[in-house]
Amino acid sequence: MTVEAFRSIINPDDPMFANPSSMVEAIQQYCRRTSQPVPETPAEICRCIFDSLALRYRQVFEWLQDFGKSQNSNLKSQINTLHIIGGGSLNKYLNQFTANATGVVVKAGPQEGTALGNIMMQAQAAGLVSDIWQMRQIIANSIDLVTYTPQDKELWDAAYEKYLKITQ
């Protein structure tokens, strides 16, 4: 089943999504309130959520880049890779949508970032590693990351403009 992309868009950080009794009903209410098509099927609801999360990631990503430039006027390079760790790194659709929306390469993994960090801290306490750079190198050499490259730039740029209008 194919579901239309960007048919319905929400701001995932809207307070109405903090702890609703029904997330589906909250999404539908938001779409009604913003005069959008109301997602009805599970596929439409999932697509709304994934599209909206990726577009929100782009917005926050742009804010962070702007903040970095404002703090360091000599900062000339843009962030060109976004790392997603933890359980979210397993969601291939959201990771691809995130790459598409942000326009940067997404590297997904490791899934168990917290556990690996804990292991590395224990290794440091035992004198087996000397610093964070060595820890990062060990993890990088031990874990296969999945790389997602941006696609469909024009489509996602248009969707982002729609997102900004809806979420103002």
Segments (PLM) and residue ranges:
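Glycine- and other small-residue-rich loops at beta-strand/loop junctions that grip anionic moieties
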Residues: 87
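Intrinsic-disorder-associated, low-complexity terminal segments enriched in Asp/Asn/His/Tyr and depleted
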Residues: 72-74
